[in-house]
Regions:
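Conserved active-site helix of classical SDR/Rossmann-fold NAD(P)-dependent CH-OH oxidoreductases
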Residues: 40-41, 88-95, 129, 166-167
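Short alpha-helix in the Rossmann-fold core of NAD(P)-dependent oxidoreductases
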Residues: 33-40, 44-47, 55, 86-87, ...
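NAD(P)H-binding glycine-rich loop region in Rossmannoid oxidoreductase-like domains
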Residues: 2-35
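Short-chain dehydrogenase/reductase
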Residues: 33, 79-88, 122-129, 158-159, ...
């Protein structure tokens, strides 16, 4: 529709581009790049042409294992799957336009987002959502055993509530002078054990089981 000029005469202030193929197990590179790179590129050039603010979803997966840190700079970036590569590829493409762009381009690197309305996400739903479903189905929560120096359930992630993500998006909408790539997380990591124990405490019963990785 954008390529056909359907939106050329519309008065749009901002585009929040949150759509993507987010399946980290997807190995079809052509499919992933069409959805996560080519479509986003089309949106960006439309926004630049019309001087519309563009705030798009990048991903903390662009940091890989995190062994290089989590700063928004190339030295920390290491895509480990097709999804992460597609996100990083567009981030690097967008970087070429930041300085000369006459309208806002912002990429938000979401960490582990959780919250309501995750039913449609299947295996890509948040760990918290999956733990709740495990308890409802089996009365217990399962976590992976330790690996790569981590103890049982001691793997860590930065979990951010979806409504806080919305607030961050709106912050950048209110500050059109800002451009670039920004992390979108809490800045604090929590273990899977902490989450699992919180779920069990909420329900008031159940057990925690560790399974081989």
């Amino acid at each position: 529709a954008i390529k056909n000029g359907k939106f050329d005469d519309t008065n749009i202030e901002v585009i929040f581009h949150e759509g993507a193929c987010s399946d980290t197990m997807e190995y079809n590179g052509k499919y992933m790049m069409e959805n996560n790179f080519e479509y986003t590129k089309t949106l960006m050039h439309f926004a630049l042409k019309k001087k519309i603010q563009l705030i798009y979803a990048s991903s903390a997966s662009t940091y890989g294992s995190g062994k290089h840190g989590f700063s928004e700079k190339p030295a920390c970036e290491e895509a480990l799957n097709v999804y992460a590569f597609s996100k990083l590829f567009f981030d690097n493409y967008a970087r070429r336009y930041f300085d000369a762009a006459e309208s806002q381009i912002v990429g938000l690197r979401y960490f582990n987002v959780y919250g309501p309305q995750e039913n449609h996400k299947g295996k890509m739903a948040s760990m918290i959502f999956q733990m709740f479903n495990q308890w409802k189905a089996e009365g217990k929560v399962k976590l992976f055993e330790g690996i790569d120096g981590y103890g049982n359930g001691e793997q860590v992630r930065d979990f951010i509530y979806v409504k806080d993500v919305v607030k961050v998006n709106f912050f950048f909408w209110d500050h059109p002078e800002l451009k670039g790539i920004y992390n979108c997380g809490t800045g604090h990591a929590h273990t899977f054990n902490t989450l699992a124990k919180g779920v069990l405490k909420y329900f008031g019963s159940g057990e925690l089981e560790y399974v081989p990785f």
